[in-house]
Structure formats: structure tokens, C-alpha cells
């Protein structure tokens, strides 16, 4: 895809198209995380409450949460396949956005048919949009352009600006004024994102187009020929790295499920005489990403300048270990609850801080890694597989949350912490062998950094 990029208008050292995708994804994540922030709380709220919910048990709510968040991301596989085979990423993102606006809007209707229909449309919409917009970000950069990782970090900050705002705004509206008002507000956010995406099409002229109609002969040939030995090896590495992804998200997504309920039911949320809404704690992750995103990216860039290990696989392993360490704070919170009958808010804050640093080391890095290693003909499909692995991690999170009803939070939090750290150290033992199979996919970045500095695309305006 990136080979077709000829001339791009730039802003702050990156293609303007990056910021179009930044705001599109920001509003998409505003709608998704806003709805996610109140979904479980809506399910478990008693029907007799002033702001009545469905009155489900914690186990039932977490089971639905697990299935929903899994299917949202598993749908990325057909979404990526449709883009590769028929539509291209650009049109797929458009159709996904339309489905999302419809899905979130229907959730505002207070009927069970609307609830399940809305969830179904959101699943289809995210499947069409999520893998393809990420692939388009990679397509904005020429092969070997060292700005690619930083571009994905900027894009990732956009995701979390949306998540931060939605957890506060949609969370507040849903908990205080009514769950369905919150769902409707999420739909308005997605509509704004869709309008912004359509308005910025002139900056996305060279990315996301269906490769079957490409004028580039090299791209046409790449779409038809079988995979080479190098491409097959790189795909193997990607699939192994996806194991890290499943484990990471299986632990991390306790945020929307078990940790969300824990904040609501077992945490002392009083602050100067005012009770902090439980859904607001989910905004901590996004807030930390906004403030720490560029710092973490700069740290890894500094390591690369110093010639220290800073490969994508190394970053992902370190991210998993850091995130796992954060769960020891939740172990402490559960221990405090068993002793005192409630736990302090600072345990949640510390846990989210470590989870965020871990996420910054693994999630945007994994997105960039896929655009480096995936064969052109399967670019969106491989991105879809990545998000499907995220979905399986989400389902795992739901199962772990359900298990807490019988095993207890202390056991679950401690088990997650220990497993993540040990699994990360185990993969670290095989890191060099796995990186050998990438056949130097990231080597050119270092060479460019040492000899040329940043590769700057043409500034001519199309």
C-alpha cells in the first residue's frame, strides 16, 4: 500500500491523513468505550432502581460482556477479508461507520429487541472499521519510514482521547440521567466521526483503495503470486506474537468487567463528600495514555539511538510484564477489602497506571508491527486476525470475571499477575529466534535513523 504514496501534505512532521484518521478513530472509540463504560452497570442495575437496568446477576452480565467484546473484535476477520477482496479499506471504514451510527442510535430505544439489534450492528460496524482504519495508518508511510511507529502512537492517543472523554461524559449521563441517554450520546459521537472522515477524503487519496484496481504493477503482481519463504516466516512470527496479545487483553479487559464492578461495589469512592462515579475509573487508562503516550514512544526511540534492544517483540514482552505487575495492586486492594470491608481508590489508580504503560508498549507497537510484517495481499486480513485475538482476550477476560464469583477477586487478581509475568519471561527466552524469522523487517529503520534522520515525504499538495 505504502509504495503508492507519492505526494502528501504534512502537518507536524506527519501526513495530514494521519490526523483525519486520528479524529475518525477518536470519535469511533468515544462511542465504543462510552457504551462499554455503562454496559455492565446497566445490565446489573436493578429494574426497581430510579435509573433502572435489566437486573441481571454479575455472572450473567460478565458473560454477555465477554461474548460481546469478543465478537466485536472477531468480526474484524471478515471485515479485513471484505476490504482485501472487494472494497478496499477506505470504503470499508465508511460502511463500518454507518453501521455504528445505526447500532448506537438503536440502543437509545428502551426495548429488548433494540438492545440486541444495536449490539449486533455495533459488532458488524467495528468489524468493518477497526482493522481497516489501522491498516490505512500504515499505508500513509513509505516502507522503512521510521516515523511509522510514532504515527501509530499518535493514532493511539486519538483512540484514548475518545475513550477518556466518553468514560466521563457518557458514563456520567448514563449513570445520572439514564442509561439510554448515554447510549444515544455514544451514537452522536460516532456520527461526528463519520462526518469528519468524509470531509477529510482529499487527504486520503492514496491510501485504503482496493488493490485489485491499483495502477501499480508491483502491487498487482504481489496480490496474485503465492507467499514467499520470507513472507511465510514473518506470518509465523505474527501469529506467535498474537499469543502475547490474547494474554494481554485477557488480563487488561478486566477494566470493563470485573474491575468496573469492583470499583462500583467494593471501593470507597468518596472524595471530599462526593461519590466518584464507578465508570470514571475507566477514564484513568485513557488519561494516562494521553499524557504518557509520547513519553513512552520517546523512551523507546532513545533506546534505539543508543543501540539498545528496542525491537517490536521486545517492547510487547516488556509491556505484558509491566501490565501483569499492575495486578499486584489489585491483589492488595482485594486484601484490604477482606480486612476492612472496602478498599482505597489509590489501588485502582496504581493498577491503571501500570496497565497503561504496559498497553503503550504492546498495543500501538503491535499495530505497527503488523503493517511491517504482513504480506500486502493479506494486510487487512492480518490486522483483522490481530483484532480477533484481542476479541478472544476479551472473552477470556469475561470468563475470568465470572470465575471470581466462586474463586474470589483476590485469587483471580493474583493469578493474572503471576501468569502474565511468567508468560512474558518465557517468551523472552525465545525472542532472538523469533526475530531472526522476520528477516530484518525492522533493520532498515535503524539504518535510516543513523544515516539519514527522518524520511520526509514530498510536501507537494495534491
Segments from the language model and where they lie:
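Intracellular loop-helix junctions on the cytosolic face of multi-pass helical membrane proteins
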Residues: 1-20, 143-146, 153, 171-274, ...
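Hydrophobic core of transmembrane alpha-helices in multi-pass small-molecule transporters
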Residues: 26, 103, 114-129, 339-361
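Short amphipathic helix-loop junctions that connect adjacent transmembrane helices
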Residues: 37-60, 255-281
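Central cavity-lining transmembrane alpha-helices of secondary-active solute carriers
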Residues: 62-83, 283-296
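Conserved MFS/SLC helix-loop-helix module at the cytosolic interface between two early adjacent transmembrane helices
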Residues: 75-109
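Cytoplasmic membrane-interface "Motif A"-like loop-to-helix N-cap segments
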Residues: 85-97, 302-321
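C-terminal ends and interior cores of transmembrane alpha-helices
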Residues: 98-116, 318-340
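Glycine-rich segments within core transmembrane alpha-helices of 12-TM secondary carriers
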Residues: 147-175, 182-193, 285-289, 380-397
Amino acid at each position: 500500500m505504502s509504495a503508492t504514496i507519492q505526494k502528501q501534505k504534512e502537518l507536524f512532521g506527519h501526513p495530514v491523513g494521519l490526523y483525519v484518521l486520528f479524529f475518525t478513530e477518536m470519535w469511533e472509540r468515544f462511542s465504543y468505550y462510552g457504551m462499554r463504560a455503562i454496559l455492565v452497570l446497566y445490565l446489573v442495575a436493578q429494574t426497581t432502581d430510579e435509573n433502572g437496568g435489566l437486573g441481571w446477576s454479575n455472572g450473567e452480565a460478565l458473560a454477555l460482556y465477554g461474548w460481546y467484546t469478543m465478537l466485536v473484535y472477531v468480526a474484524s476477520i471478515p471485515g479485513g477479508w471484505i476490504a482485501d477482496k472487494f472494497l478496499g479499506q477506505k470504503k470499508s471504514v465508511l460502511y463500518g461507520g454507518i453501521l455504528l451510527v445505526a447500532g448506537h442510535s438503536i440502543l437509545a430505544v428502551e426495548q429488548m429487541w433494540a438492545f440486541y439489534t444495536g449490539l449486533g450492528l455495533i459488532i458488524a460496524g467495528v468489524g468493518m472499521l477497526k482493522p481497516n482504519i489501522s491498516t490505512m495508518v500504515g499505508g500513509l508511510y513509505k516502507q522503512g519510514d521510521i516515523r511509522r511507529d510514532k504515527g501509530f502512537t499518535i493514532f493511539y492517543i486519538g483512540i484514548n482521547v475518545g475513550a477518556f472523554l466518553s468514560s466521563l461524559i457518557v458514563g456520567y449521563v448514563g449513570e445520572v440521567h439514564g442509561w439510554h441517554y448515554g447510549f444515544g450520546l455514544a451514537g452522536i459521537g460516532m456520527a461526528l466521526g463519520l462526518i469528519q472522515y468524509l470531509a477529510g477524503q482529499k487527504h486520503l487519496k492514496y491510501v485504503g483503495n482496493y488493490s485489485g484496481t491499483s495502477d501499480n504493477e508491483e502491487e498487482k503482481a504481489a496480490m496474485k503470486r503465492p507467499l514467499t519463504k520470507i513472507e511465510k516466516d514473518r506470518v509465523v512470527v505474527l501469529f506467535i506474537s498474537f499469543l502475547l496479545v490474547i494474554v494481554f487483553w485477557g488480563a487488561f479487559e478486566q477494566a470493563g468487567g470485573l474491575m468496573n464492578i469492583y470499583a462500583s461495589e467494593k471501593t470507597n469512592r468518596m472524595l471530599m463528600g462526593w461519590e466518584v462515579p464507578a465508570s470514571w475509573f475507566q477514564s484513568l487508562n485513557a488519561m494516562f495514555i494521553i499524557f504518557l503516550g509520547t513519553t513512552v514512544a520517546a523512551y523507546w526511540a532513545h533506546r534505539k539511538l543508543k543501540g539498545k534492544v528496542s525491537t517490536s517483540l521486545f517492547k510487547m514482552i516488556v509491556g505484558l510484564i509491566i501490565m501483569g505487575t499492575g495486578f499486584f495492586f489489585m491483589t492488595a486492594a482485594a486484601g484490604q477489602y477482606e480486612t476492612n470491608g472496602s478498599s482505597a481508590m489509590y489501588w485502582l489508580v496504581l493498577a491503571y497506571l501500570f496497565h497503561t504503560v504496559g498497553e503503550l508498549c504492546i498495543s500501538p507497537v503491535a499495530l505497527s508491527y503488523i503493517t511491517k510484517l504482513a504480506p500486502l495481499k493479506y494486510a487487512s486480513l492480518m490486522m483483522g486476525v490481530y483484532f480477533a485475538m484481542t476479541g478472544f482476550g476479551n472473552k477470556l477476560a469475561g470468563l475470568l470475571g465470572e470465575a471470581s464469583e466462586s474463586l474470589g477477586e483476590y485469587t483471580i487478581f493474583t493469578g493474572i499477575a503471576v501468569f502474565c509475568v511468567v508468560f512474558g519471561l518465557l517468551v523472552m527466552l525465545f525472542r532472538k529466534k523469533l526475530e531472526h524469522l522476520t528477516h530484518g523487517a525492522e533493520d532498515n529503520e535503524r539504518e535510516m535513523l543513523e544515516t539519514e534522520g527522518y524520511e520526509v515525504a514530498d510536501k507537494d499538495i495534491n
